[in-house]
From Swiss-Prot:
Physiological role: Catalyzes the ATP-dependent transfer of a sulfur to tRNA to produce 4-thiouridine in position 8 of tRNAs, which functions as a near-UV photosensor. Also catalyzes the transfer of sulfur to the sulfur carrier protein ThiS, forming ThiS-thiocarboxylate. This is a step in the synthesis of thiazole, in the thiamine biosynthesis pathway. The sulfur is donated as persulfide by IscS.
Principal localisation: cytoplasm
Binding site for ATP: 183-184, 208-209, 265, 287, 296
Catalyzed reactions per annotation: [ThiI sulfur-carrier protein]-S-sulfanyl-L-cysteine + a uridine in tRNA + 2 reduced [2Fe-2S]-[ferredoxin] + ATP + H(+) = [ThiI sulfur-carrier protein]-L-cysteine + a 4-thiouridine in tRNA + 2 oxidized [2Fe-2S]-[ferredoxin] + AMP + diphosphate; [ThiS sulfur-carrier protein]-C-terminal Gly-Gly-AMP + S-sulfanyl-L-cysteinyl-[cysteine desulfurase] + AH2 = [ThiS sulfur-carrier protein]-C-terminal-Gly-aminoethanethioate + L-cysteinyl-[cysteine desulfurase] + A + AMP + 2 H(+)
GO cellular component: cytosol
GO biological process: thiamine biosynthetic process; thiamine diphosphate biosynthetic process; thiazole biosynthetic process; tRNA 4-thiouridine biosynthesis
EC number: 2.8.1.4
Keywords: ATP-binding, Cytoplasm, Nucleotide-binding, RNA-binding, Thiamine biosynthesis, Transferase, tRNA-binding
Designated gene of the protein: thiI
Name under which the protein is recorded: Probable tRNA sulfurtransferase
Family: Belongs to the ThiI family.
Limits of the THUMP domain: 60-165
Subcellular location as annotated: Cytoplasm
Length: 401
């Protein structure tokens, strides 16, 4: 007897009340997309949990993929048997025997959801625990801190046995909170912001500002590689690559050096907001962390934000750099982010940027420029590619067929 299914627990989704089924269906669809390489599996779901029937598929690679699906609190390999005491005993014993149990401790934790079952939970604990002890060697009982917790759940459709919980990615299923545009540079912070945004259920489309010849094709490829890492958590992601050279040069030539960074960020936000409207997004996500650099002081963010009424979400706002780096390493974006290819945010960085810019002065400087046609041109010439975890990338036209 082998594990024949994986039991999935929802966690935060259980608080969603009448809307829970919307979240559960989205999670099922996200899991099905993630596991499409395993055609024999079958996914069954109910209000409080989900089951993946393996039907002969190997569980190890499936477990690895489930760890990156948002909306899963935890999951366990499981066996199912009839609501019969003898069958439950043998199933629990088989589950323990598939583990390296010798020299370990265990306990049995039974839960009788089906109140028609003739044995109480404590009686099941005793009966099954005694059977396991009789049929194994070098395994002892520890009810307080066991190495192995044999969980038995008697439900109306059958009894489920698990022995080991694996923590999932948590959060909410991607797509349940709407769509947002992620302003993605080649640095450490913005990919982490994208990851955390998806963890809260957002579908993201990435926007990258590309300034050739000052930034190279290698810098562009670096961003594509970062997006591909994020697809492990969110599925296919659109990447919008904005030609930004003319806008950036106009600002650099027409705005005093200490204010150029603020005006550049304002232009980026205007373009991103226009792309958001075109793509029917509801918010913009950035990798800003309060006080980390000159453009991320509260005064700077206030002046930059003035160009839009769209919600600007900043998942990293209270994190320090070391916390951000730790997450970047966990999601495998760190080593790509530190590759030495400059992005548009670094090539025209002023020596002494204003950390407390005045909105009136920014507006005065920008009034001397005719940026609107350049912004419109950048929006119209934006290149869109679709990046997938498995398939790599395709341009938007190809991706439609």
């Amino acid at each position: 007897m082998k594990y024949d299914r994986i039991l999935i627990r929802y966690g935060e989704m259980t608080t969603k009340g009448k809307n829970r089924n919307i979240f559960v269906r989205r999670l099922k669809n996200n899991i099905a997309r993630k596991l499409q390489a395993f055609p024999r599996i079958k996914i069954e779901y109910m209000r409080d949990r989900m089951y993946i029937l393996l039907n002969g598929e190997p569980h190890e690679p499936i477990i690895d993929k489930l760890k990156t699906v948002f909306g899963i609190h935890s999951f366990s390999l499981a066996m199912k048997c009839e609501n019969d005491l003898a069958a439950i005993k043998e199933t629990a014993l088989a589950a323990v025997r598939q583990l390296p149990y010798k020299g370990k401790t265990f306990k049995v934790s039974a839960r009788r959801v089906d109140k028609q079952f003739p044995y109480r939970s404590d009686e099941l604990n005793h009966e099954v625990g005694a059977h396991i002890l009789r049929q194994t060697e070098d395994l002892t009982v520890n009810v307080r801190q066991p190495d192995i917790d044999v969980r038995i759940e008697v439900r109306q459709d059958g009894t489920y046995v698990t022995c080991h919980d694996i923590f999932g990615a948590g959060g909410l299923p991607v797509g349940t909170s709407g769509k947002a545009m992620l302003m993605l540079s080649g640095g450490i912070d913005s990919p982490v912001a994208g990851y955390l945004a998806m963890k809260r259920g957002l579908e993201i489309e990435a926007v990258h500002f590309f300034s050739p010849p000052f930034t190279s094709e290698r810098a562009k490829q670096k961003v594509i590689d970062l997006v591909r890492k994020l697809t492990a958590y969110g599925g296919k992601i659109k990447l919008h690559i904005v030609p930004f050279t003319e806008v950036q040069q106009a600002i650099y030539q027409g705005v005093p050096n200490e204010y150029s960074l603020i005006s550049t960020r304002r232009a980026m936000l205007k373009i991103t907001d226009a792309l958001r409207r075109r793509q029917r997004g509801l918010a913009i996500v950035t990798g800003e962390s309060l006080g980390q650099v000159a453009s991320q002081t509260l005064e700077s963010m206030y002046v930059i934000n003035e160009v839009t009424n769209t919600p600007v979400l900043r998942p990293l706002i209270s994190m320090d750099k070391m916390e951000i780096i730790e997450i970047a390493k966990q999601i495998d974006t760190h080593d790509i982010s530190i590759l030495p290819y400059e992005d548009c945010c670094t090539i025209f960085t002023p020596r002494a940027p204003k950390t407390k810019p005045k909105k009136e002065k920014v507006l005065q400087h920008e009034s001397q420029l005719d940026l609107a046609p350049l912004l419109e041109k950048a929006i119209n010439e934006t290149e869109t590619i679709v990046i997938d975890e498995e398939a790599g990338q395709a341009d938007e036209f190809t991706a439609l067929f």
